[in-house]
């Protein structure tokens, strides 16, 4: 009887343990509230993706995430990858501050208080390299040629430091640089056979890559800053295709001037046009990032709209700077020769190219409705009319918040249609740009009071008819504020980064 009771207890314990154990899909642990803590306790290093099943970015990440999980598991690594459906596990999502999809957190030793946000690229190599940097030495010691070859083959880009004295000042500087870069594997060696294998007879640093010239040898004094600059200049291809996976590398880098070739892969002489673009890129390494975009791909249509381009206008070239403000530039010539592209880049760097501001044609009936229609060509005249108080909505046709606001804005226009000095207006900011106003989120609401000093007041009050009326009747005071606050509110209201109405989302998609 006692034996039977003990057997029942043992079976019950086994059943309970099995019920909570995570399932696996393609080597990725499937977590939920019932097994999350157990997984943290069982695995020293755990990378967790919080996703939504309908999220396009999550779907694009899935195969690379699974590939990374499989690679680590095959190596016998202590690192495991996991995922949580945040739409089903809202408590977990809230606990870990999930505001967009995918959100990826790295847990070390079961620490739930301060998991580290994953910020590197979305290819398997990027994920693996980032995790290894977080769990091991900044640079692995390469004791023989096989170890060095394995490191070089493990990733699209790898960096090896060759130092006969691994305690030298140069070697220490190398380690400092290695600690800064998360998504590239670093190795260090003093082995003479490894020196010979890669044709080095003295100390040096080599960046190996599976594209372009294959390797770059560092020249000069080895310092952390110079090494970081060397890697920045050489880690990306001369020309990189924009994809879901390459986007973090493109926008996470230090090069903030990008020239874009919108090139349909179906176009005649596709290879020739791409070759011209690549030839031009050789003169601007580390200064301008050369990117090509398949303009036929449906996922890239928003980017074309952002630049005011239509598919039938491609191939085409545009340049953009991604500093505090995004500024676009358009070549004077439509020729896509290497010479013309090179000349355009030189003129831009010399400050001889003016920003390109888009504008639609002015509709004949732009002022016939209570809400006036503004485009780039009539904005200055209407918004800065010294005798009128002009309240403008800057919107995007695809923006959900703008669609919700539209009937209220129309009622506001109706309210003031006969007012002697108040004008209600709107402008499609995806097709029109003006130098006086930089739009960072949609909708952006700005008030231009009647005056000669070109004052602009941001509206950050309630988006209601009463709220707008109080603002106008108070002369632009009741509801005035910094539009940065509104941007944060929009992100809080709509946590899906894929549908984020912030113009920065377009930057992420470029």
From Swiss-Prot:
Its main location: endoplasmic reticulum. It is an enzyme of class 5 (isomerase). GO terms for molecular function: procollagen-proline 4-dioxygenase activity; protein disulfide isomerase activity; protein heterodimerization activity. One of its GO terms (biological process) is peptidyl-proline hydroxylation to 4-hydroxy-L-proline. A motif (Prevents secretion from ER) lies at residues 507-510. The record marks 56-57, 400-401 as: Contributes to redox potential value. The active site is at 55 (nucleophile), 58 (nucleophile), 399 (nucleophile), 402 (nucleophile). It is a peripheral membrane protein. The modification N6-acetyllysine is found at residue 202. It catalyses: Catalyzes the rearrangement of -S-S- bonds in proteins. This multifunctional protein catalyzes the formation, breakage and rearrangement of disulfide bonds. At the cell surface, seems to act as a reductase that cleaves disulfide bonds of proteins attached to the cell. May therefore cause structural modifications of exofacial proteins. Inside the cell, seems to form/rearrange disulfide bonds of nascent proteins. At high concentrations and following phosphorylation by FAM20C, functions as a chaperone that inhibits aggregation of misfolded proteins. At low concentrations, facilitates aggregation (anti-chaperone activity). This is Protein disulfide-isomerase. The lineage of its organism: Eukaryota, Metazoa, Chordata, Craniata, Vertebrata.
């Amino acid at each position: 009887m006692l034996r039977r009771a003990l057997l029942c207890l043992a079976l019950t314990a086994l059943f309970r343990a099995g019920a909570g154990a995570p399932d696996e899909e393609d080597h990725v642990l499937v977590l939920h509230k019932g097994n999350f803590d157990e997984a943290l306790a069982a695995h020293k290093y755990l990378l967790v993706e919080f996703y939504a099943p309908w999220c396009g970015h999550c779907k694009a990440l899935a195969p690379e995430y699974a590939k990374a999980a499989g690679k680590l598991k095959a190596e016998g690594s202590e690192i495991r990858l996991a995922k949580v459906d945040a739409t089903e596990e809202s408590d977990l999502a809230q606990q870990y501050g999930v505001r967009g999809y995918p959100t990826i957190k790295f847990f070390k030793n079961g620490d739930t208080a301060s998991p580290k946000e994953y910020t590197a690229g979305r290819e398997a190599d990027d994920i693996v390299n980032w995790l290894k940097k977080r769990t091991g030495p900044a640079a692995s010691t390469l004791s023989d040629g096989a170890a060095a070859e394995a490191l070089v083959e493990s990733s699209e880009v790898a960096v090896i430091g060759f130092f006969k004295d691994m305690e030298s000042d140069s070697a220490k500087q190398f380690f400092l640089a290695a600690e800064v870069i998360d998504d590239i594997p670093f190795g260090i060696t003093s082995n003479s056979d490894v020196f010979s294998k890669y044709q080095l007879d003295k100390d040096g640093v080599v960046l190996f890559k599976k594209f372009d010239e294959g390797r770059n040898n560092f020249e000069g004094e080895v310092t952390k800053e110079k090494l970081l600059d060397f890697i920045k200049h050489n880690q990306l291809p001369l020309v990189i295709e924009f994809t879901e996976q390459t986007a973090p590398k493109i926008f996470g880098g230090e090069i903030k001037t990008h020239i874009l070739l919108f090139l349909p892969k179906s176009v005649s002489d596709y290879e020739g046009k791409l070759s011209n673009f690549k030839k031009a890129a050789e003169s601007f390494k580390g200064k301008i990032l050369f990117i090509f975009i398949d303009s036929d791909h449906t996922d890239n249509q928003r980017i074309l709209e952002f630049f005011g381009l239509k598919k039938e206008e491609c191939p085409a070239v545009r340049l953009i700077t991604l500093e505090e403000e995004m500024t676009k530039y358009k070549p004077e010539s439509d020729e896509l020769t290497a010479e013309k592209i090179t000349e355009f880049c030189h003129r831009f760097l010399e400050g001889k190219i003016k920003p390109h501001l888009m504008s639609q044609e002015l509709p004949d009936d732009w002022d016939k409705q209570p809400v006036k229609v503004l485009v780039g060509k009539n904005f200055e005249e209407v918004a800065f009319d010294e005798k009128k108080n002009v309240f403008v909505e800057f919107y995007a046709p695809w923006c959900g918040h703008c669609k919700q606001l539209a009937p209220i804005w129309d009622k506001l226009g109706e309210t003031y249609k006969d007012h002697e000095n108040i004008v209600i207006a709107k402008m499609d900011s995806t097709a029109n740009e003006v130098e006086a106003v930089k739009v960072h989120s949609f909708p952006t609401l700005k008030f231009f009071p009647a005056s000669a000093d070109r004052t602009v007041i941001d509206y950050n009050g309630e988006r209601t008819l009463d709220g707008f009326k109080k603002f106008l009747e108070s002369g632009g005071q009741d509801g005035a504020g910094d539009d940065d606050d509104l941007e944060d509110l929009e992100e809080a209201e709509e946590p899906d980064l894929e549908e984020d109405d912030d113009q920065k989302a377009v930057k992420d998609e470029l």
